[in-house]
Amino acid sequence: MSYREPLGEYDCHIDNTRNMPPDTTIVSKSKKGKPARLQVDPESIPDDDRPPQTGNVFNIWFLKWSGGDSSTKNYTKSKFRVNIKKDSGYTKAPSNAPLCLFFARGCCYLGKKCSYYHRLPSDTDYFIPTQDCFGRDKTSDYKDDMNGVGSFSKSNRTLYIGGLHMDDKMENTLTKHFQEFGSIDKIRVLHSKACAFVTFRTENEAQFAKEAMQNQSLDGNEVLNIRWANEDPNPEAQRQEKRRLEEVTVNTVKNLLDSVSQTERKTKKVTVEVPDEIEETESSSEIKALPSSETSSGLFNNSSLNALKQFQSKKRKIDKPQPKENLPTMLGYSSSDEE
């Protein structure tokens, strides 16, 4: 007898396909996608891999110190960077889990065992309005330096990109590095101030790109400083943004109405089909109940017992004595005359 190795995670036993029709298509388990790979080996990360101490408390979410001198001016290039094509994959994240912040930064060491999603934000994602796509709580207003998670009172899709080394192809360079994280609506480069503004299609894409490209470099040795952009003071830009929000609202309402109409159609189909099934089950149960009513344990069946009960009730009515008030009419005198 030949020995066969144990089946792997994506292995398929060939003997199960012998009785299948020739046109049968076998769906492989690998359709689920590839697992998320380890971006960083846990053993390669030292315990003191953090920026120089400039405060009293180190914030692991923002990778900087607080409670002391400001460390915002001490920019150092990040050792890690996410590669969406190589690093994306399925994880153990539940359906309502946010995206992995450390995956966006390129330094998640859990891989497919991570409890957060390792992918880009999509249009079907729903995140709590008071949180970003990574599950961090927003604030009512922006920080003074326009850094951090952002504000829940306003939707912002534009990022401020500082620390650029300007050249004539800067717009193309920014497009090449930032289009990996989402659809870009527009890019505005200010050569005199060595900065640029990148506007994404959705706020979730801007949130992901901000964390992915913070402290990264483009084609040179620059270190990017990425923050949230202030509102554009141009009246025409404000009008365009207002029209865009109105279009988004109209499309959202249309999608909701379409979903409601589809659910109503499904419920109507169900309500029409259900009574037919109930009638069939009731009629079948009645047909099955007929022979059981005729056969019963004992001397008499159920129908005979019911007939006897009806006869007994009629007999009681006949044998019931007449009331005393009818006696005087029969004898001709009442009880008072007898006295």
From Swiss-Prot:
Keyword Cell cycle carried by entry: yes
Gene3D superfamilies found in the cross-reference section: 3.30.70.330
UniProt feature, compositional bias: Polar residues: 292-311
Any one annotated GO CC term: post-mRNA release spliceosomal complex
Keyword list, A-Z: Cell cycle, Metal-binding, mRNA processing, mRNA splicing, Nucleus, RNA-binding, Spliceosome, Zinc, Zinc-finger
Localization per Swiss-Prot or TrEMBL: Nucleus
InterPro entries registered for this protein in UniProt: Cwc2/Slt11 (IPR039171), Cwc2_RRM (IPR034181), Nucleotide-bd_a/b_plait_sf (IPR012677), RBD_domain_sf (IPR035979), RRM_dom (IPR000504), Torus (IPR032297), Znf_CCCH (IPR000571), Znf_CCCH_sf (IPR036855)
GO molecular function, a single term: U6 snRNA binding
C3H1-type ZnF: 94-121
Span list, region Disordered: 17-52, 276-339
Record's signal peptide: none
PROSITE patterns xrefs: RRM (PS50102), ZF_C3H1 (PS50103)
Function statement: Involved in the first step of pre-mRNA splicing. Required for cell growth and cell cycle control. Plays a role in the levels of the U1, U4, U5 and U6 snRNAs and the maintenance of the U4/U6 snRNA complex. May provide the link between the 'nineteen complex' NTC spliceosome protein complex and the spliceosome through the U6 snRNA. Associates predominantly with U6 snRNAs in assembled active spliceosomes. Binds directly to the internal stem-loop (ISL) domain of the U6 snRNA and to the pre-mRNA intron near the 5' splice site during the activation and catalytic phases of the spliceosome cycle.
Comment on protein domains: The C-terminal RRM domain and the zinc finger motif are necessary for RNA-binding.
Subunit-structure text: Associated with the spliceosome.
Protein name in UniProt: Pre-mRNA-splicing factor CWC2
Species: Debaryomyces hansenii (strain ATCC 36239 / CBS 767 / BCRC 21394 / JCM 1990 / NBRC 0083 / IGC 2968) (Yeast)
Lineage: Eukaryota, Fungi, Dikarya, Ascomycota, Saccharomycotina
